[in-house]
Amino acid sequence: MKLRANRVGEQMKKELGDIISRKIKDPRVGFVTVTDVKVSGDLQIATVYISVLGDEEQKENTLKGLAKAKGFIRSEIGQRIRLRKTPEISFEFDESIGYGHRIDTLLHEINKEGKREE
């Protein structure tokens, strides 16, 4: 069952990227990238991880715009993907990108310090 949830998640990721970029007309929803979709084993709940270009205020506005369009997005997913019941969708920010950038910065600092000591 886990394999099917992964396949549904990947398909939803592809479709959500298209829906958000082409169908959502809300001005609060700017440059959004769908980075991952985690679907529960029973295919009832989908958590969509997004990355937003902009400051914290723009990120919050984007999240509000997506929450407002959640019903429309869910109906579009239901039309595009054949499932018995379309999963409930929740949106969250993907913190892994910032975390990866921070690790990269720390590694560069360590590398610079190592070169100075030589």
Curated annotation (Swiss-Prot):
Pfam families in the cross-refs: RBFA
InterPro entries in the record: KH_dom-like_a/b, RbfA, RbfA_dom_sf, Ribosome-bd_factorA_CS
This protein's UniProt keywords: Cytoplasm, Ribosome biogenesis
Subcellular location: Cytoplasm
Keyword Nuclease among UniProt keywords: no
GO biological process: maturation of SSU-rRNA
MF-aspect GO terms: ribosomal small subunit binding
Stretches assigned to coiled coil: none
Any one of the GO CC terms: cytosol
PROSITE patterns, sorted: RBFA
HAMAP family (UniProt xref): RbfA (MF_00003)
Family per similarity comment: Belongs to the RbfA family.
NCBIfam families linked to this entry: rbfA
Subunit field text: Monomer. Binds 30S ribosomal subunits, but not 50S ribosomal subunits or 70S ribosomes.
Function: One of several proteins that assist in the late maturation steps of the functional core of the 30S ribosomal subunit. Associates with free 30S ribosomal subunits (but not with 30S subunits that are part of 70S ribosomes or polysomes). Required for efficient processing of 16S rRNA. May interact with the 5'-terminal helix region of 16S rRNA.
Designated name of the protein: Ribosome-binding factor A
Origin organism lineage: Bacteria, Bacillati, Bacillota, Bacilli, Bacillales
